[in-house]
Amino acid sequence: MVQSLRLGAANEAEDQNGMRRLNRLPIIVAIVIVALFVGFVVIGLAWRGLPFNRNNDIHSASNTPATNFGDQLKRGVTDGIIGEPVKREAFQPTPTMKQKVDKEPTVVDRPTEPEERRPRLETEEEWKARLMREQDEQIIREAQRQRMARLQARATALDSPLKVDISEGEKAPKNSTDTGQNPTATENNASDLYPAAMKSGIMGENLDPNAQASKEDFFNQDIKDDGYLPNRVVPQMSVYELKRGSVIPATLITGLNSDLPGRITAQVSQNVYDSATGYRLLIPQGAKLFGRYDSKVSFGQERVLVVWTDLIFPNGSTLQIGGMAGTDAEGYGGFKDRVDRHLWRTWSSAALIALIGTGIDMSMPESSTLATQDTASDAVRRNFAESFGRVAEQTISKNLNVQPTIRIRPGYKFNVLVDQDIIFPSAYRDN
């Protein structure tokens, strides 16, 4: 019973034996720190109130009498009596003396622009004098011009040769008599020198832009003189003769491209006989033609000019035919087959430039300022528009200046037009 009643007391005793008491060392350390802090604060406040400048007599003399302090303040200053303040007189301006001044007439400035804008009308005498002066000046200038022209003509005449070479004139009648021509043809050519000189003199004035006068001269150059013809009938010189106006049918062997100049060859496609009888074979089928073409093609041109210079026979002999023109199968001058005008490149470049310029113009922000102000965006937009406009114009102009390309394919049938009489030694024989 007794043991059961002490069960709780035993537990408490065990708890008291297992409890750890608080150590007093931290409390002492905290008290020391607080004391040190308070001591430092007190010492600092005390030092702030102490004087540091011991040499200053005024501040250090706390026990000195007030009389000595006053003497120290007025040290070096002599004794004096302070009198009454001096009265200052108020500033009064000196009166100005009135002088009699003569009144000058007032000049009113009036605008002179209307007077300058309105020209002063000339009198009749001044007008006549001015006209006479201008007339005299023109007369003097014209006289000076005529005088200088006479001096220049005289100098040219003095520098000209004194001999005239008439050897060419003597050779011309001999050649005309040898070929059966009349010497009057030379006289007609000499009579045309003056009109030719007049035309060459006024050529720079561009009085005939369509060249109508040259067309009339071309049409009437052989019928200027009425009556008999100056030339006589020339008899046939050989039975193996091919007259002018005849044609030589041929077929093109090599192709033709007008981008670059070059040489071409062809082959005679039919036998060619003499012009008088038509029975003597002069040029056999299979003979070769050698020629050249003109690569200078202008804008809008569809035909290319071809000339033939050599005729090579199957037996190996060669005949130089000078430069006879080639015509197509229908008789038109030049060759025509395929023409490339490069329109796709021209219009595609123009469309591309337009699209680029439109895109850049649309990408720029619109200006919200007044019309009189110029912002950076407006300047950029304007510069881009001008730059692309110039680029587009130059690109299109360059593409327009590109000449069209004319292509003549191999196998093209044409004719060689004989423009001079050809005399063969004999009928063709294959040796």
UniProtKB/Swiss-Prot annotation:
Give the residue spans that cross the bilayer: 27-47
Read off the InterPro entries from this record.
T4SS_VirB10/TraB/TrbI, T4SS_VirB10/TrbI
Which Pfam families does this chain map to?
Answer: TrbI (PF03743)
Residues spanning the signal sequence: none
Q: What subcellular locations does the record give?
A: Membrane
What are the record keywords, sorted? Answer: Conjugation, Membrane, Plasmid, Transmembrane, Transmembrane helix
Q: What is its main location?
A: membrane
Q: Does the keyword ATP-binding apply?
A: no
Comp. bias (Basic and acidic residues): 99-122
- Where composition is biased (Polar residues), the residues are 174-189
A single Gene Ontology CC term: membrane
Q: Which domain of life is it from?
A: Bacteria
Q: Topology versus the membrane, per the UniProt entry? A: Single-pass membrane protein
- Cite the residue spans of the region called Disordered: 95-122, 161-189
For this protein, the record's NCBIfam families field holds: PRK13831.1
> So what family is this one in?
Belongs to the TrbI/VirB10 family.
Q: Report the protein name in the record.
A: Probable conjugal transfer protein TrbI
Species whose genome carries this gene: Sinorhizobium fredii (strain NBRC 101917 / NGR234)
Q: Which gene encodes it?
A: trbI
